[in-house]
């Protein structure tokens, strides 16, 4: 018996995305927080970034994708969704790992905002130094 749905959790910056892939016979649609991606995200580049693993593997039409994403901004959310899609695709077919790993899509991007330190204006910006 074949699995009904595949799950992947993706994180990027302060965003977290739960991705559910459901096999379908239709053209395959994507919903992000119960909305269409073009309605949810402000620009097309973010949507292309999110759909990159599906374009690489030519599986865009094979799945209905339902995403629940929280936290962060649009770029972080798109990165979290992308990693979630990759992890769910690997559950579906582990042989896709070679293609996805060659484009560095299987690893989490661990870069996060550096914290502000006391005595400074930001993470690194220091007050102006006066010699005399």
Curated annotation (Swiss-Prot):
Record's keyword annotation contains Kinase: no
GO molecular function, one term: RNA binding
Family: Belongs to the universal ribosomal protein uS9 family.
Signal sequence annotation: none
GO process terms (BP): translation
KW Cell inner membrane (keyword) present: no
GO cellular component, one term: cytosolic small ribosomal subunit
Protein's name according to its UniProt entry: Small ribosomal subunit protein uS9
């Amino acid at each position: 018996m074949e699995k009904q749905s595949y799950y992947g959790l993706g994180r990027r910056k302060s965003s977290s995305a739960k991705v559910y892939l459901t096999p379908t016979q239709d053209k395959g649609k994507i919903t992000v927080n119960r909305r269409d991606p073009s309605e949810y995200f402000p620009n097309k580049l973010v949507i292309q970034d999110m759909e990159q693993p599906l374009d690489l593997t030519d599986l865009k039409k094979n799945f209905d994708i339902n995403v629940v994403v929280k936290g962060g901004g649009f770029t972080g959310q798109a990165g979290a969704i992308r990693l979630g899609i990759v992890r769910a695709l690997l559950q579906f077919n582990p042989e896709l790992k070679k293609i996805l790993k060659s484009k560095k899509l299987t690893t989490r991007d661990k870069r996060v905002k550096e914290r502000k330190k006391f005595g400074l204006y930001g993470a690194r910006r220091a007050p102006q130094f006066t010699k005399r």
